[in-house]
């Protein structure tokens, strides 16, 4: 599981 990718997606979803 790519945590960096997940974090990026979460950040994008928060925006």
Curated annotation (Swiss-Prot):
Subcellular location: Secreted; Target cell membrane
GO terms of biological process kind: defense response to bacterium; defense response to fungus; innate immune response; killing of cells of another organism
Expressed in which tissues: Expressed by the venom gland.
Major site of localization recorded for this protein: secreted
Residues at the site labelled May enhance the stabilization of the helical conformation but leads to a lower membrane selectivity compared to its homologs that do not have a C-terminal Asn: 15
Residue positions, PTM Asparagine amide: 15
Superkingdom per UniProt: Eukaryota
Keyword annotations from UniProtKB, A to Z: Amidation, Antibiotic, Antimicrobial, Fungicide, Immunity, Innate immunity, Membrane, Secreted, Target cell membrane, Target membrane
Primary role: Antimicrobial peptide with high activity on Gram-positive (S.mutans, and S.aureus), and Gram-negative bacteria (S.enterica), as well as on fungi (C.albicans, C.glabrata, and C.neoformans). Shows a potent hemolysis on human erythrocytes. Together with phospholipase A1, stimulates prostaglandin E2 release from murine peritoneal cells and macrophages.
UniProt-recorded name of the protein: Mastoparan-V1
Protein source organism: Vespula vulgaris (Yellow jacket)
């Amino acid at each position: 599981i790519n945590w960096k990718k997940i974090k990026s997606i979460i950040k994008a979803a928060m925006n």
